[in-house]
């Protein structure tokens, strides 16, 4: 069973609110989950402490058990100082399209 820590959307139309949950990766985004770890309210100001609330002890336990955080949750954990997020690197992104196609044709 592949376990992931991710955001599950709640709230109403045009007023998003997210629960930070632990779920099996095969379950739907807003479907069944194993445990709720906190919440994220994107409508609040970025400097407001109530914008993101996480139970850090539970998060650490799930990470120790092998749960993989989603990209957005990994950002939250990096900000909280729990888990360092690796920078993504795409070296082909900087190469112009014409040069990229020429390099692929030359291979």
From Swiss-Prot:
Keyword Ribosomal protein: yes
Region annotation Disordered: where it falls in the sequence: 85-107
Highest taxon listed in the record's lineage: Bacteria
GO molecular function, one term: structural constituent of ribosome
Keywords: Ribonucleoprotein, Ribosomal protein
InterPro entries: Ribosomal_bS16 (IPR000307), Ribosomal_bS16_dom_sf (IPR023803)
SUPFAM superfamilies for the chain: Ribosomal protein S16
GO biological process: translation
GO CC terms: cytoplasm; small ribosomal subunit
Keyword NADP: no
HAMAP family, per database record: Ribosomal_bS16
NCBIfam families, sorted: S16
Record-stated family: Belongs to the bacterial ribosomal protein bS16 family.
Name of protein: Small ribosomal subunit protein bS16
Source organism of this protein record: Rhodopseudomonas palustris (strain BisB5)
